[in-house]
Amino acid sequence: MINYLKSFFLYEIVRGMALTLKYFFKPKVTINYPYEKSPVSPRFKGEHALRRYENGEERCIACKLCEAICPAQAIVIEADEREDGSRRTTRYDIDMTKCIYCGLCQAACPVDAIVEGPNFEFASLTHTALIYDKERLLQNGDRWEQALASKLHKDYEYR
């Protein structure tokens, strides 16, 4: 009988309208995305980049720790030895469609060569555009170097 009276007086509709009025006058939390962007944490893991030293030499020493630790097996590295005995990468590919953005590659790197930068807008229409080669990763590093250095400095106390 009580259920019948509640439905007769449209109790559910009144409760729904009360809830609507409750939130109607609160400030909006929606962000108009292409024109407004929400703040990004300094520990955000975005698009990958390879960094260089100040003299322009790439940091990667071809230790392959990032390739070994990657749980998604998204990183492929090939290396050659130089005349001075040091190793440098000849091929450094990351398949961004396999990457799970866990940050283990960045944590494993002893020289901070591979980092996950602040960029999150790298959508593509083709699969091949999401397979990053060494040149693209170095371009990302050059483009985002100031932000990457700032991010690593802020994150230093947690390492």
UniProtKB/Swiss-Prot annotation:
Q: Which NCBIfam families match?
A: NuoI, PRK05888.1-4, PRK05888.1-5
How is this protein annotated for GO cellular component?
plasma membrane
Q: What EC number(s) does this enzyme carry?
A: 7.1.1.-
Q: Which cofactor does it need?
A: [4Fe-4S] cluster
The alphabetized UniProt keywords are: 4Fe-4S, Cell inner membrane, Cell membrane, Iron, Iron-sulfur, Membrane, Metal-binding, NAD, Quinone, Repeat, Translocase, Ubiquinone
Question: What gene is this protein translated from?
Answer: nuoI
Give its localization.
Cell inner membrane
> What name does UniProt use for this protein?
NADH-quinone oxidoreductase subunit I
